[in-house]
Amino acid sequence: MAKEDSIEMQGTILETLPNTMFRVELENGHVVIAHISGKMRKNYIRILTGDKVTVALTPYDLSKGRIVFRSR
C-alpha cells in the first residue's frame, strides 16, 4: 500500500486486543480494528487505552487500519 493511497484520520484507542491489535474510534464515530505500524513496533512505542492516535486506512477496506502515530 503506497503512502499516498491511504486515508489518515485521528482516533482514540477504545480497547486492546490480542496480537497488538486495537479497537479505535475515529473522529467521525466509526470504530475500526488497527494494528501498529512496523516503525512503531521497532521503536517499542507503547499504546494504551485512551491514547489519541493517527490511523491510516486503505480505500479498499475501511474497517481495518494501521496506527502510524501516537499523539503526546
From Swiss-Prot:
Isomerase is among the record's keywords = no
- Keywords, in A-Z order: Cytoplasm, Initiation factor, Protein biosynthesis, RNA-binding, rRNA-binding
A single GO cellular-component term from the record reads:
cytosol
Please state the protein's primary subcellular location. cytoplasm
Q: Return the SUPFAM superfamilies for the record.
A: Nucleic acid-binding proteins
Q: What does this protein do?
A: One of the essential components for the initiation of protein synthesis. Stabilizes the binding of IF-2 and IF-3 on the 30S subunit to which N-formylmethionyl-tRNA(fMet) subsequently binds. Helps modulate mRNA selection, yielding the 30S pre-initiation complex (PIC). Upon addition of the 50S ribosomal subunit IF-1, IF-2 and IF-3 are released leaving the mature 70S translation initiation complex.
Task: From the Swiss-Prot or TrEMBL record, give the protein name.
Answer: Translation initiation factor IF-1
In its UniProt entry, the species of origin is given as: Aeromonas hydrophila subsp. hydrophila (strain ATCC 7966 / DSM 30187 / BCRC 13018 / CCUG 14551 / JCM 1027 / KCTC 2358 / NCIMB 9240 / NCTC 8049)
